[in-house]
Every structure is written in C-alpha cells, then in structure tokens.
Amino acid sequence: MRTKKQNFFLFLKIFAAIMVLILGGLYYFRDALLQQVIAKAETKFQTDYNCHFSVKKANFNGLSEVELHNILLVPQNADTLLAVQNIKTSYSFLELLTGDLQLNNLEMNNGFIQLVKNKNGRNFDAFLKRDNQEKSAEKRNYAKLAYRILSKVLNLVPSEMQLKNLALRTDDMGRKVVFQLNNLQLEDKKLQSDIIVKTAALTQNWKISGFADPRDKKADLKFSSNDTTKIQVPYIDERFGLKSSFDNIQVKLDKLEMESGELHIDGFTSIQNFTLNHPKVARKDVVIENARFNYRFLLGSDFISVDSTSSAQLNHIKVKPFAEYNTEEDTIYKLKVALPKMKAQDFITSLPKGLFTNFEGMEAEGTFDYQLDFEYNKNKPNKLVFDSKLNKENLRILKYGAANLAKLNGEFTYRAIENGVEQRPILVGAANPNFTPLDQISPFLEKAVLTNEDPSFFHHRGFINEAFKQSIVKNIRTKKFARGASTISMQLVKNVFLTREKTLSRKLEEILLVYILENNRIASKSRMLEVYFNVIEWGPNVYGIGEASQFYFQKSPSELSLSECLYLASIVPKPKKFMWQFDGEGNQKSYAVKNQKYIKNLMLRRALITDLDTIGQSVPIYISGKARSFLKLNTVVDSTVTDSISFDPDEFDF
C-alpha cells in the first residue's frame, strides 16, 4: 500500500505528464490554433463591425513568438482603416496561462492607420457604436474598472519595441494631417522616437524621448521639437481657428497602484512657453511661460478625485486644487481651490501675457491668499455651495497699468466702442454741459436703476455671491451660459476701461479690475454711480443721463417723473431697441408697461418709494424729444390693428 508521500509524488508525475502533453500539443498545433484565432477575428470584425479583416500569412517562431504579414482592416464601402506589412511579437507564456496577455517584444514595419471623414461618413463609425447589451444593475466600481483597463493596456505595451515607417493619417473633410513615425525604439527602458508631422501648411519634426517601464507602471517622457522651433499643434487651427504651440511637454508617472481598495495615480506634467491664439480668448497671443501640475488622482468604488495634495503652478502662482465626482448617495461635484499667501507683485507678473493686457506694467505691494469652495448636488441644485474668500495684508496699488482706475475720481474723456470703432468723445466732468452730478439726478432714477440692475450696489464689494450661485445653477440646468451676474461695478469697469469684445480675456480682466476697484476704496460708491449715470448708453448715440433726459422727454435729469425714471431704468439692458416698446400710436405696449409696474412694485415693497410718490403716475409716458422720430408711428390710425407682440417674461431677467 502506497504512503501519502508516494501518492503525492505520483500526483506530481501525472500532473507533469499532462502538462507536457498539453504543451506538446500546443507546440505541435500552434499554427493551426493561430489560424483559428485569426479566422475567429475575421468573423467578429465582419459580423460586429461590417469590416473585412485579413492576414495574408501568420506563423509561430518557437512557442511564444508570432509573426504576421500583410494585415488589413477595411470597412465596407469606406477607406482602409489599417494596413501593416509586418508584425513580429513575443509574449509571456506564463502570464498567458494566468489569463493575462503580456507582450515582451514588438517589431512593426511599414504600415498606417487612417481615419477619414468625408461626405459619405467616417471609416471608423462602426467602432463607435454603443453596446446594446443591458447594463448590469450592479454599481460600477471606478477604482477596479480603471485599474483593470490601465493594467491591460500597459501589459500590451511591450518592454522592448521597435517601430519603423508607420503613419497615422487623418482626413476630416479635406483637413489632412499625417504623423509619420520613421523610427521608435524602446530598449532597456529608454524610449526614443522621431516623428514627421505634415499638414497642408507646414512640416514639423517632433521627438519623444525618456524613460518608460510598462511592467513597473512608470514613465518620464519629454515631447519636443527636433530643431529649435516650437511645436505647433496641427488640425485644431484649421478646424476651430485655434492656434497653439509650445517648446516642450514633460509627462511623468511615478505610481499606479491599488491601495486599500483605492487606485492611486501619481506624477506630474509640465509645459514650457505655451502660446494660444483664438478670437474668443484674446485679441493677441496668450503666452504661458511655465506651467506645471503635480497630480495625485484617487479613484474609489464610488468617487473619482484630484486629491488635495496635488498642486498646480503658473509661473510664480501656486494653487492647491481639490476636485471630486462622487456617487455614493447623490451625484455630487466638488471643487476647492486654495491659493497660499503670496506677494501681489508676483501674482501680477505671473499672469499670462496677452490675457491681462490692462495689468501689464502694474505695480503693487502687500500679500494675499484666496480660497474657493464649490459643491453642486445634481439632485438638490438649490443647495449649491459657492464660497469665495480673499484675504489681503497691506495690499496697495503703487502704479496702474493700461487701466488707470484712479481716473474715476477726476475729469476724463470717455469713448464708447462699437464694433471695434471708437465713438465720439464724452467728457466726464463739469466742462460738459450734459454732465450731471448725482445730487442733480432725480432720486427716482437712482432707485429705479438700482432696483432693476443692482439692488445691493451700496453694500457689496463688486460681486454678489448669491447672484453667482443662481447664475451657476441656471447655467448648469440649461447646459449653456444662459444667465449672467453682472453688477453695476462690473458694468462700469467694462464701459470705462474695457472693450465690448466677448472674449475670455475681457471677462477675466473685468473680474480682477472690479475686485481691485471695490476692495481698495479707489473711488467711493457715490462717485462710481455718478460716473455710471453719465457714461452708460441710453439710446442710439445717446450717452449719459443728461443726453437721455433731453432725447426722450426734453427735460433735465432732476425734472424726471417716477414713470419716466421707470421707463429709463427698463431700457438700460437694451437701449438701442427702445422703439419696439411702442405701438403705432406712440403708446407703450402692454409687456413694457407690465415690466415697469413690476419694478415700481419692487420699489414699494422695499420702501424706496411710498404710495404718495405714485399718485398721478398712471398717466402713460409721452416721448417728446428726438427719440420720437425713431418710433414706428402710423400716419393713419387703424383701430383694427392689434398688438402682435406678447409679453415674454424671460426677456427681462431680474
């Protein structure tokens, strides 16, 4: 009778014999098995993607090296998607036995991938279709899913690689770009490549070099030009009119690991001398000399986040960001930004050139820090959190740039800009007979305009957090910038110091200039409002209340009635379209009357006016000045004509 030890060794012998038979069978039938795999792939491409896939010749060299010749992938009635003359690769047999395909070596020569979009469609559409299979009711685990995908991708990146004469060709309705990879070599964890990029307008020589270890999941790669020129990003200039270039980009991956059920991805990326040009961004080139992002991405079972230990740097400006998408209970978006204490002058000199032209040459002293806290619950949008806080210490402007905010306190010349063209000069000062001091303007006008435009003007510091919150909620709901949150301070800065161009640059400058104006007490609130009333547009080529009161009513600003002030306040958002408020008889249409009544009722509720002030105000306003010539009046009154314009409550957003 055999002992347990003898039985164990017998089992090992039998197991070894079976493994030898299996390996021998695999070795003997390896080419036949390879043909079956290729045939299965051909069938899948045909049935699932309506594509013809073929390999002219395929064979094994030994047990773990495969060689393929003349590989083609051609969608039906479309341009060839892929063609490669020769592929030779080896894989880890032991890893394959565990269910993971891990490539050790890869050689690929003479081929291309081609992405085409033309009037007949796209040659890659079949690969973008959605999977119609029912989704599992099981909650998705972001960490496990991401780690599984990234691990499989990195396993398919060989530890040794040589690619020669390969190309990526793109053709988007005639906009063609060719990325020609003459040679890419990965050996002893060192990557070196040369790429020629061709478009209709230019030819560039790029290179990628550095350290790459797909098995240890680490890399440190630098992307730059082979000569002294900057890399120009192709395609997007032709497609979107966005011109961009840079000296080099560096990407480093230090860590990609699962720890306690969370996926950690650590590293950094940086860019040097990044230049951007687009008419929606700024009038001139925007230049970022140095930018760096030290990242730590964390993925858990129900969240994806940029960890608070991450940091971003723009020249001398350092930021500590935190962002999170969380689905544990509700769908919640979080964003926190902390700008540690820094010198004000370092902040000014670090701003991207071309994006803040009015700040160029500005000098300041003192320090400040900043915190932003934002949280949005998709299921509870009205509970949005938006908290912005800036702390300053001995902050003082020593010298202004192009925008001299101090000029608000004295006499100056204002020129409105229409379609990029300066309009006639308006002198803001006593030498202008139309200039009207604040105490000589009807108090009804001040109260009506503030009620309609900025009720808390005398109390805020340029911005209204609650208005921003409402604006954000509405923009998210409508998925577009449907609502703004502009204060009188912002309107004043925009009118006096900036152009009317709708660019990112102009909006960012507006925000910063308003903050400086309001928080450094450069001009009093009363003076700001006085300038505002004397420069804003109140009709076609009508600027300031002095001109407006004569243009509409042939009165001085102090003589305006409550009804006339309500009318003037109501047309501030769209002054050039005032004539559409009136019918053919010169009377205000019902929607305009309703809007002005709404403003009046708000003023009553806020005790800005009394019931006595409204006595006699039911009489319709009469346009008696030059504005009457702009009205579409009937020469013969037709009593059958009805008002075709109905009240649109969304036309006036309070």
Provide a role label for each language-model segment.
Residues 151, 155-156, 418-608:
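Peptidoglycan glycan-strand catalytic modules in the bacterial/periplasmic cell-wall system
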Residues 171-189:
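Short, solvent-exposed loop/hinge segments that bridge or flank secondary-structure elements
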